[in-house]
Amino acid sequence: AAADRLHAWWAGDGSALNDSDKLFSKQLPGTDFEKSVWAAARRVQPGSCASYGDIAGVIGVPRGAQAVGNALRRNPVLLMTPCHRVLPASALEAAKRAKRLGGKPYEAVGGFSGAMTGPLTDLKRHMLIWEAERFGSAEPALF
């Protein structure tokens, strides 16, 4: 089931992972807060992005951006819960500005899976670019 969805997503079906929470939500380890963050992150569509603060607002903790980042760092299923689509507000604004000016979006992406630099953040950047090219809008937008 999960493998089939990943294959469909890789083949270009941007909606293949939309309801992945049905596969995992009750089985995932984590606190209720972490699970609410992961559920909100799953609502961010391919080719779109949200900020940590956006996710915090959606789950009812408007000043909880840092806690959202910490919860995403503990995400146990990286592609099925697309935490790579969640960026610091400054990186989201920089990506929007770069797109308007014809530059490269996603030069700054924040952390990924606990790393702030290096191969994991490079992977996050490449996933964002790949999804924007594959599934449409490179314009960062919430949900």
For each feature predicted by the language model, list its residue ranges.
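Basic nucleic-acid-binding alpha-helical/helix-turn surface characteristic of O6-alkylguanine DNA
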Residues: 1-63, 106, 122-143
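Short glycine/serine-rich loop segments
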Residues: 63-119
